[in-house]
Structure formats: C-alpha cells, structure tokens
C-alpha cells in the first residue's frame, strides 16, 4: 500500500496550534515594495491569522500525517 504524502508547500505555510483546532499562517504583502504601504497597514500585516473553516478542511486533506 502506498504512503500518502504531506504536501510540502502547505507544511511550510501553515502551523497547527497546540489545541489542534486551528491553523496559523503569516499574511502576505510584507516582503518588498513597502514604501507605498502605510505604517498601519504594515503593522496589521505582521499579525498572524487563522485559517477559516472551509480552508481548514482543505489543509487537513493536504496534511494527512499532521
């Protein structure tokens, strides 16, 4: 029987919380071209976010062994 593999890109982007109920991820748009973005916008982008219920199902399908 073949082993089901984790999708590596999903492993790198999402981290499971300690309670195993949520997946944490970093918001995009904070790598380059930061001069035109306001300080408030950059500060809000630094905060980690949690995946929605719909995304959680997709993430769990991509991570069978997590």
UniProtKB/Swiss-Prot annotation:
Pfam families: Ribosomal_L35p. It comes from the Bacteria. Keywords: Ribonucleoprotein, Ribosomal protein. One of its GO terms (molecular function) is structural constituent of ribosome. SUPFAM superfamilies: L35p-like (SSF143034). GO terms for cellular component: ribonucleoprotein complex; ribosome. GO terms for biological process: translation. HAMAP family: Ribosomal_bL35. Belongs to the bacterial ribosomal protein bL35 family. This is Large ribosomal subunit protein bL35. It comes from Wigglesworthia glossinidia brevipalpis. The gene is rpmI.
